[in-house]
Design a protein with these regions (language model features):
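Generic structural signal for small/hydrophobic residues in well-ordered secondary structure
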Residues: 5-6, 40, 78, 96
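Short, hydrophobic beta-strand segments that form beta-sheet elements in well-ordered domains
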Residues: 8-12, 31, 67, 100-105
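Acidic, PIN/NYN-like endoribonuclease modules and their adjacent C-terminal/linker elements
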Residues: 93-120
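Acidic catalytic patch
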Residues: 57-82
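A generic structural signal for short hydrophobic patches within well-formed alpha-helices
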Residues: 9-10, 37-40, 75, 110-111
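Short, well-structured N-terminal submotif of metal-dependent ribonuclease cores
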Residues: 1-32, 44-59
Length: 120
């Protein structure tokens, strides 16, 4: 299983994934933190991306995912990471730590972490 950062979900929906990212996604089941859905909604609201959350494509993608809720353990872990970022990124990274699943991300701060399990 792979946990996806928001940037990977958006690139997947807009056709911007690399061949390596596509290969990883095709070989694993997929999960996201529930805060990814909030981040996507905010980016749409701010007109930074153009996606339709009601589209058949988005609903189909969502039905194939495991969505992890923010738990007390994930919230605690988000404060014990070896990097500082925006709260959503910290929750996403902490989800990977707590659930012990690699995170697929392009975020440089997270990629430099020694704590967060990363997709290779």
């Amino acid at each position: 299983m792979l946990n996806l950062d928001t940037n990977i979900v958006i690139e997947g929906l807009t056709g911007g994934l690399t061949n390596h990212e596509i290969a990883l996604l095709e070989s694993e089941s997929i999960a996201i933190s529930d805060i990814v859905l909030w981040e996507i909604s905010k980016l749409i609201q701010l007109q930074r991306i153009s996606l339709d959350l009601e589209s058949t494509e988005f609903r189909r993608m969502l039905a194939q995912l495991t969505v992890y809720p923010i738990t007390a353990e994930i919230a605690r872990q988000s404060t014990a990471l070896d990097f500082r970022s925006d709260p959503a990124d910290e929750i996403i990274a902490a989800t990977s730590v707590v659930e012990k699943i690699p995170l697929l991300t392009r975020d440089r701060k997270i990629l430099n972490s020694k704590i967060v399990p990363l997709a290779k």
